[in-house]
Amino acid sequence: MVAVLALVAQLVALGLYAAKGARFARESAAGRIGTGMLLGMLGLGFVWLAQFPFGLAALWWERDHGISHQGYLTWAIDDFLLAGGRFLFISLALLIVMAIAGVWRRRWWLAAVPALLAVSALFAFVQPYLLPNIHALRDPQVAADARQLAAAEGIPGTPVRVQNTRNLGGAPNAEAAGLGPSRRVIVWDTLLKRFPPAQIRVVLAHEFGHLSRDHLWKGLAWTALLLLPIALVVELVTRRRGGLYEPTAVPLAIFVVVVLLFLATPLQTAFSRRLESEADWVALQTTHEPGATQALFRRLSRLALVQPDPPRWTKLLLEDHPSVMERIEMARAWRARH
């Protein structure tokens, strides 16, 4: 519910900014592109302020239920730094788009999409190097398991790194990150400390599955499919304000992008769930441990206090992973077939 309220707050804040934000351009002497970038950052600032109370409420709930041990001040600083990263990304995106619009007033969207994809690929490439508190695997048995699993999935030598998250607490996590030579698996230290070896193997095999099946590249391809129609709609909607050649169109453009991404949420979550299901299946095929897989998902569900079988609307709008029951049923189906 908090996530839904935060989304409503975001849409309301951006809707008001789209209606009134153009007037801020009159106060700027930063030039056409500079003013557009400032308006973009201002819009994200309004969104951050609107969502901040809901983030605090979510943290309070997690602390109250023992999911997180992070302090409020630490969380606020982290959230502010995360917002800074978003400011950087939106500024770079507006710099690219408005520069292209200066050359092709109404065809900018055709050239902007590949340029934005290149930026997204660059961010994906460097992201593993920007994560804090990272170190190599120190457990020789886990390291040996990781090497064996990576080789079994056709990606030998793929590194595994550990992220210290002792200040965050909560349910353990892991992720596949990077592109090409930067790709790797990141596991939280809480996973290694609190889960048995068989379940750690399942997690590692799942994350290696994302890499061996090129899910990050597929994610970029999916982004391209979304960006092209979104950019075209932005061009059509902002045309009365001069298109993205004019900085006064930036507040409306941001609102349109967020609304379109919201409307595409069911497609995005379905795509993500499909990739996660494939990684689950790869893990089962690699580890041959359906019992450990079922135990893993049950334990993660208890730690994170998530619904094993959430309502359909929640699944469509909020769930980018299969439900716990769906993942357990897959493990049972694998066992029945083998």
Stretch-by-stretch model annotation:
Residues 1-244, 258, 262-338:
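Polar-ligand-bearing catalytic/cofactor-coordination segments
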